[in-house]
C-alpha cells in the first residue's frame, strides 16, 4: 500500500484539509488491499501503526515532546495494536502531576483537531495516581490500562503506571477473573445466551471477538501474556487451540473489516442491510441469497467454536490456576467414567480416541444421573481432540449405533442429553447430515434460528408435552404424546425433518430418504422406518393445511385425511407440527394457531373414525346449527317468525361456515338494528378461535373487503382469516379473524374506536386508500418475487388462488381492490405471514358466480403483479 508516512508530514501539511486527504488516501488503500485479499491481520495492525505515527507527529507539532513527565498512551483495543476502519482510538494523556491550565488548553486543541479529522477518539487526561484510583474502582478502566502501550513522551511516567497496573494490589488475579466472568455472563444475557441472533454483533455476541478478548485479559492479568501466542507458551492453550483461536479471530476480523468499509458510523451489528455487501466482499457468492447464507453459516460456526473454547478454557483456568488444582472427590461410575461434583469426567486420558463409542456412553450416564449437569473441562478438552481426530462418523460404528438408539429411547435423554450433545458437537460427529446443517441459516425474518438450533429446540418442545402443566398451552399434544407407543420414532422424525436444508431441492424429500436409510441401519423395522420417513416428508402438511386452506370445506378435510390415512399418523404428526411451529420462532405460537390445528385435528379424527367413504352430510350440519342458534335467539326474546324471516334472506353457506353461537350473536344484533341502512360492525369481546372476530353487516359496496382490511392495517391489526358472504337481497355478512401485532386478540378497550372508524369508512364513500403506513425498516432489505397460482380443486363453482408476495403494508387491501375492479367476487381468504413473506389463499368466483376462465386467471395474475409492484417500498 503506497501512502506517505505521517512522520514525514511537514508543518504545512498539518491542516485539517490536508490531513483529511491523507487519511482518505490511507483508508482507500486499505480498502483496496482488503478487496484484493490482503491478510486482514496486516491491515488491522498497519492501521494502528499508521495512527501511532500520526499521533506522534501531531504530539511533536504541538510541542508536547519537549515537556517532561507527560506521555501519550494507547489503551484498549488500540493499546493491543488493533484498529479496524471505524474502531475507537482510545488514548490516555498521562502525567506525573496535575497539568497547568495553559497545557490543558493546548491538549484541548490537540484533541479537537483529531475530532475535526473525524477520528473516533476516546480520550482521558489523568495522573498516575488518578489512573490507579479510578482503575481500582472501575473494571473497564482497569482492563483498558492493562493493555496500555506507550506511543510517545515520558518513558518513566509510563513505567510508573505499569508498576501500578501490574501490582497484585491493583486487581488481584482471582478478583479480576471473577469480575470478568460476571461481566461476560451479563453481556451474554443481553444476547439471550445464544450465538444465533439474526443480526448479530460481531464483537459482543456470545462467541464473538469479546469472548477472545476475555481469554486474553484473564491470561494477561495472571501470566502477563500479551498475545494468543504467549498464552500458548504459558500452557493456557494447546497448540491446536491456539491455531483454532487465531483462525476464528481472523475470520471474525475479516467480517468486521468488510462491515466497517461499508459503514459511515461505528457499528458492529451485522444487520440484514449489510449482510449482502459483507458476503460479497468476503467472496461468498451464489444464486439468490445463497452467498449470504454461506457466509452466515461460516460466521455462526465460528461463533460456536469460540464460545466452546472460551467456556472450556475459562473453566480450566478456574480449576487449575484459581483453585490451585483442588477438586472435589471423585465418585466412580464405572471403569471409564467418574463424577466429580456435578461434572462427569473420563478416567483415562485417551478414552475417546481409543474407543469413540464411549462418547455416547458418557451421555447415557448424563441421562441416567440427574446430579450430573455437564462435562468436566479436561474431559471436554479430550472430547474436542477426539472429535477432530475421528476418521469416520460415529454412526458407522455398530456399538455406537446401539448406544445412540438407547439414548433415543431413554426417557430422560430429551431434556438431559440431546441439547448437550449438540452443543459439544457430538451430533455432528455422529451424523454426517447433521454436520451439514450446523450454522445453516435462512436469510429471512421467519426462521430466527439456524437449522440445527431449531431442530434441537424442536426436540426440547416435544419434551414439554410430557408435563401436565403445559396442558393449557398444548392441550392436544399433552393428551396425545404420553400415549404414543414409540416416542423414539417422533424424535427421529424431529432430528431429520429439516436435515435436507441447504443442499438444493426439496428438503422434505431429501430428508425422507435419509431418515428411512438411517432407521433401517439402526435396526428399526420397515413399518417403523416408513412412519418416520413419512413424517419427515409431510412435516409441513398439517401446518399448511390448517393455515392456508379452507378447513371448513369438507373436501379439504377429506383430502387431508386421505394423506394421513390413520389416527396413529395423525397423532404423531400433530405433535411434530406443534413442536415445529414453536421451535421456529418464539412469537409464532398463539391461540389462533392452536385453534386452527385443533379444528383440523378433530375434523380429521372424526372423518377417519366415520370412514372416508362416509362423507359428512352438509344439510344435516346446517339443520343442526340452525336449531341450536334458534334456541339461543328465542331465549333473547325473538319469535320463531322473526328468526325465520331473517334467515330466509341468508344463503345455506352462511349456516355451514359459522358455529351456532356465531349465528346467534350476528342475528341478535341484526334483529335489534334501528336503521338497516346503516352498517353494523361487531367485535367479539372474548377471543373467538384464538382471535377477535370482526363482523360486518351492510349493503354491499365496491371494494368493501379492501376498505375494511385497509382500516385494520392502518391500526396495525393483522387479518388472518375472512369469510365473505352475501345475502340474497344484496347485504354482506363478512367475518374477519383479527390479531394484534403480538398475535393476541385485540384488547377490548380498543373495540369502541375500531368500530367507530370502520363505521366511518363504510359510510364515507371515498375511494379506499390501500397503503396506510410506511413499510417497516426490516422489510426493506428483503425481496420476495410476487407469484399468483391457481390451485386445482374439484369445485366447478369456485377458483382457489394462492398469492405469495412481500408482506408490505396495503398488500391485502390492494389485492381485494383488484378483485373488485375486475368484477370478481371474493368468498374467503386465509392470510398467512411467514416472516417477510405473505402466503395467502383466496376463494373467488366470476361476476356471474362461476369459476374463473383461463383468460380471466391470466388477466388477474398480470393485474395483481402490476398493482403489488406499485406498493414496493
From Swiss-Prot:
Q: Tell me, what controls this protein's activity?
A: Uridylyltransferase (UTase) activity is inhibited by glutamine, while glutamine activates uridylyl-removing (UR) activity.
Q: Which residues form the ACT domain?
A: 693-773, 800-873
Where is the segment annotated Uridylyltransferase?
1-332
* Biological process, per Gene Ontology: regulation of nitrogen utilization
Cofactors that this protein relies on: Mg(2+)
- Pfam families membership: GlnD_UR_UTase (PF08335), HD (PF01966), NTP_transf_2 (PF01909)
Disulfide connectivity for this sequence is none
Domain HD residue range list:
451-573
Q: Which InterPro entries match?
A: ACT-like_dom_sf, ACT_dom, HD/PDEase_dom, HD_domain, NT_sf, PII_UdlTrfase/GS_AdlTrfase, Polymerase_NTP_transf_dom, UTase/UR
Which keywords does UniProt give here?
Answer: Hydrolase, Magnesium, Multifunctional enzyme, Nucleotidyltransferase, Repeat, Transferase
Annotated stretches, region: Uridylyl-removing:
333-692
Task: Report the catalytic activity.
Answer: [protein-PII]-L-tyrosine + UTP = [protein-PII]-uridylyl-L-tyrosine + diphosphate; [protein-PII]-uridylyl-L-tyrosine + H2O = [protein-PII]-L-tyrosine + UMP + H(+)
Domains: entry comment: Has four distinct domains: an N-terminal nucleotidyltransferase (NT) domain responsible for UTase activity, a central HD domain that encodes UR activity, and two C-terminal ACT domains that seem to have a role in glutamine sensing.
As for what it does, the entry says: Modifies, by uridylylation and deuridylylation, the PII regulatory proteins (GlnB and homologs), in response to the nitrogen status of the cell that GlnD senses through the glutamine level. Under low glutamine levels, catalyzes the conversion of the PII proteins and UTP to PII-UMP and PPi, while under higher glutamine levels, GlnD hydrolyzes PII-UMP to PII and UMP (deuridylylation). Thus, controls uridylylation state and activity of the PII proteins, and plays an important role in the regulation of nitrogen assimilation and metabolism.
Full protein name: Bifunctional uridylyltransferase/uridylyl-removing enzyme
Organism from which the protein derives: Vibrio vulnificus (strain YJ016)
Gene symbol of the encoding locus? glnD
Amino acid at each position: 500500500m503506497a501512502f506517505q508516512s505521517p512522520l514525514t508530514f511537514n508543518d504545512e501539511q498539518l491542516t485539517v484539509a490536508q490531513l483529511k486527504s491523507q487519511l482518505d488516501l490511507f483508508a482507500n488503500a486499505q480498502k483496496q488491499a482488503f478487496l484484493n485479499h490482503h491478510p486482514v491481520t496486516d491491515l488491522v495492525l498497519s492501521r494502528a501503526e499508521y495512527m501511532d505515527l500520526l499521533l506522534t507527529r501531531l504530539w511533536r507539532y504541538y510541542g508536547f515532546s519537549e515537556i517532561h513527565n507527560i506521555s501519550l498512551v494507547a489503551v484498549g483495543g488500540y493499546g493491543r495494536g488493533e484498529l479496524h476502519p471505524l474502531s475507537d482510538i482510545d488514548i490516555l494523556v498521562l502525567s506525573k502531576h496535575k497539568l497547568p491550565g495553559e497545557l490543558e488548553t493546548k491538549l484541548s486543541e490537540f484533541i479537537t483537531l483529531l475530532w475535526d479529522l473525524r477520528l473516533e477518539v476516546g480520550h482521558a487526561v489523568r495522573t498516575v495516581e488518578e489512573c490507579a484510583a479510578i482503575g481500582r474502582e472501575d473494571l473497564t478502566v482497569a482492563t483498558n490500562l492493562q493493555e496500555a502501550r506507550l506511543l510517545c513522551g515520558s518513558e518513566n511516567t509510563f513505567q510508573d503506571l505499569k508498576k501500578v497496573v501490574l501490582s497484585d494490589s491493583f486487581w488481584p488475579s482471582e478478583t479480576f477473573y471473577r469480575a470478568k466472568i460476571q461481566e461476560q455472563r451479563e453481556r451474554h444475557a443481553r444476547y439471550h445466551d445464544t450465538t444465533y441472533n439474526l443480526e448479530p454483533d460481531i464483537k459482543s455476541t456470545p462467541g464473538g471477538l469479546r469472548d477472545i478478548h476475555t481469554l486474553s485479559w484473564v491470561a494477561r492479568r495472571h501470566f502477563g501474556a500479551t498475545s494468543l501466542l504467549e498464552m500458548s507458551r504459558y500452557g493456557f492453550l494447546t497448540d491446536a487451540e491456539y491455531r483454532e483461536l487465531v483462525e476464528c479471530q481472523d475470520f471474525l476480523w475479516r467480517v468486521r473489516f468488510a462491515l466497517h468499509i461499508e459503514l459511515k458510523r461505528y457499528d458492529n451489528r451485522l444487520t440484514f442491510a449489510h449482510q449482502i455487501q459483507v458476503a460479497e466482499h468476503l467472496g461468498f457468492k451464489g444464486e439468490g441469497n445463497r452467498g449470504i447464507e454461506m457466509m452466515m453459516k461460516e460466521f455462526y460456526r465460528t461463533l460456536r467454536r469460540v464460545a466452546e473454547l472460551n467456556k472450556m478454557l475459562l473453566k480450566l483456568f478456574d480449576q487449575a490456576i484459581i483453585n490451585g488444582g483442588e477438586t472435589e472427590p471423585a465418585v466412580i461410575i464405572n471403569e471409564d467414567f467418574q463424577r466429580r461434583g456435578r461434572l462427569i469426567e473420563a478416567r483415562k486420558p485417551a478414552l475417546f480416541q481409543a474407543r469413540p463409542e464411549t462418547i455416547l456412553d458418557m451421555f447415557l450416564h448424563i441421562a441416567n444421573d440427574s446430579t450430573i449437569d455437564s462435562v468436566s473441562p479436561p474431559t471436554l478438552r479430550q472430547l474436542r481432540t477426539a472429535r477432530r481426530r475421528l476418521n469416520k462418523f460415529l454412526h458407522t460404528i455398530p456399538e455406537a449405533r446401539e448406544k445412540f438408539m438407547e439414548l433415543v429411547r431413554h426417557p430422560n435423554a430429551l431434556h438431559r442429553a440431546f441439547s448437550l450433545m449438540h452443543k459439544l458437537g457430538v451430533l455432528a460427529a455422529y451424523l454426517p447430515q447433521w454436520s451439514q446443517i450446523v450454522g445453516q441459516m435462512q436469510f429471512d425474518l421467519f426462521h430466527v434460528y439456524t437449522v440445527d438450533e431449531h431442530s434441537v429446540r424442536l426436540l426440547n418442545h416435544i419434551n414439554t408435552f410430557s408435563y401436565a402443566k403445559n396442558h393449557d398451552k398444548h392441550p392436544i399434544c399433552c393428551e396425545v404424546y404420553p400415549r404414543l407407543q414409540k416416542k423414539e420414532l417422533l424424535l427421529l422424525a424431529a432430528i431429520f425433518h429439516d436435515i435436507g436444508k441447504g443442499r438444493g431441492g426439496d428438503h422434505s424429500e431429501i430428508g425422507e430418504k435419509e431418515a428411512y436409510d438411517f432407521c433401517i441401519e439402526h435396526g428399526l423395522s420397515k413399518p417403523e422406518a416408513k412412519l418416520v420417513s413419512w413424517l419427515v416428508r409431510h412435516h409441513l402438511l398439517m401446518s399448511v393445511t390448517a393455515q392456508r386452506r379452507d378447513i371448513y370445506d369438507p373436501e379439504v378435510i377429506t383430502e387431508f385425511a386421505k394423506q394421513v390415512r390413520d389416527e396413529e399418523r395423525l397423532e404423531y404428526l400433530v405433535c411434530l407440527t406443534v413442536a415445529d411451529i414453536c421451535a421456529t420462532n418464539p412469537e409464532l405460537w398463539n391461540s389462533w394457531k392452536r385453534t386452527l390445528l385443533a379444528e383440523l385435528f378433530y375434523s380429521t379424527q372424526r372423518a377417519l373414525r366415520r370412514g372416508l367413504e362416509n362423507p359428512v352430510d352438509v344439510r344435516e350440519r346446517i339443520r343442526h346449527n340452525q336449531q341450536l342458534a334458534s334456541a339461543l335467539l328465542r331465549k333473547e326474546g325473538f319469535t320463531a317468525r322473526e328468526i325465520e324471516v331473517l334467515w330466509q334472506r341468508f344463503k345455506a353457506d352462511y349456516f355451514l361456515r359459522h358455529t351456532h353461537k356465531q349465528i346467534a350473536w350476528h342475528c341478535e344484533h341484526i334483529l335489534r338494528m334501528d336503521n338497516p341502512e346503516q352498517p353494523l360492525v361487531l367485535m367479539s369481546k372474548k377471543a373467538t378461535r384464538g382471535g377477535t372476530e370482526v363482523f360486518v353487516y351492510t349493503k354491499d359496496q365496491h371494494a368493501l373487503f379492501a376498505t375494511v382490511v385497509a382500516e385494520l392495517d392502518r391500526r396495525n391489526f393483522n387479518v388472518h382469516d375472512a369469510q365473505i358472504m352475501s345475502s340474497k337481497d344484496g347485504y354482506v355478512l363478512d367475518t374477519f379473524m383479527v390479531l394484534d401485532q403480538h398475535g393476541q386478540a385485540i384488547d377490548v378497550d380498543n373495540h369502541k374506536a375500531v368500530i367507530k372508524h370502520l363505521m366511518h369508512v363504510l359510510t364515507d364513500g371515498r375511494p379506499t386508500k390501500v397503503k396506510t403506513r410506511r413499510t417497516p425498516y426490516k422489510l426493506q432489505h428483503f425481496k420476495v418475487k410476487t407469484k399468483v397460482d391457481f390451485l386445482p380443486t374439484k369445485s366447478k363453482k369456485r377458483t382457489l388462488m394462492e398469492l405469495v408476495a412481500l408482506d408490505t403494508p396495503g398488500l391485502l387491501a390492494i389485492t381485494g381492490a383488484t378483485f373488485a375492479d375486475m368484477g370478481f367476487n371474493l368468498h374467503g381468504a386465509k392470510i398467512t405471514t411467514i416472516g417477510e413473506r405473505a402466503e395467502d389463499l383466496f376463494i373467488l368466483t366470476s361476476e356471474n358466480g362461476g369459476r374463473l376462465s383461463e383468460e380471466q386467471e391470466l388477466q388477474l395474475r398480470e393485474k395483481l403483479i402490476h398493482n403489488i409492484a406499485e406498493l414496493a417500498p
